[in-house]
Amino acid sequence: MGRAEREAFLAEPRVAVLSVVSEGDRPPSTLPTWYAYEPGGTLTVVTRQGRRKSRLIRRAGVLSLSVQRPEVPYRYVTVEGTVVRQEPATEADLRRIGARYLPAADLDGWVAWEAGGQNANGTPEVVEVRPDRWLTGDFS
């Protein structure tokens, strides 16, 4: 895929798989995640402050994120990038990501739930990543 095509593919609302180096002799931590991306910009994910994924990302300072189209013809885009921001998520951060995945009627309630600290998994944290390397596949 060329630059414009891979960036457009990544900008579509897909569930991504995020990988970050783990501790000790454990394999990389690999988890599904929501994300936001606009062509030419940075990649943004939300995690939880103090949780394992957040700690690993902070320690490593880099991560990989992969999205795919599971139907024939298969396609995928993987981004390897450097963390440029990791801090408490604002309502604007939550809204930007949530709007990609939730029906409009549910977005305000979800943002209020997350921003209000009602998620038992912890306080939302935004991680912003600068894409450094792109890997793509197109089996059409």
Regions found by a protein language model. Give the residues of each.
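Extreme N-terminal tail/first-helix region
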Residues: 1-15, 73
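Short secondary-structure boundary/capping segments
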Residues: 7-8, 35, 55, 117-119
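Alpha-helix boundary recognition
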Residues: 10-11, 58-59, 98
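Short beta-strand segments
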Residues: 13-49, 57, 63-67, 76-78
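A short beta-turn/loop motif at secondary-structure boundaries
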Residues: 24-27, 70-73, 117-121
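Short acidic (Asp/Glu) patches
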Residues: 50, 61-64, 107-114
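Short, surface-exposed beta-strand-loop junctions and turns on beta-sheet-rich folds
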Residues: 51-53, 72
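Charged, gly/pro-rich active-site loop segments
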Residues: 75-140
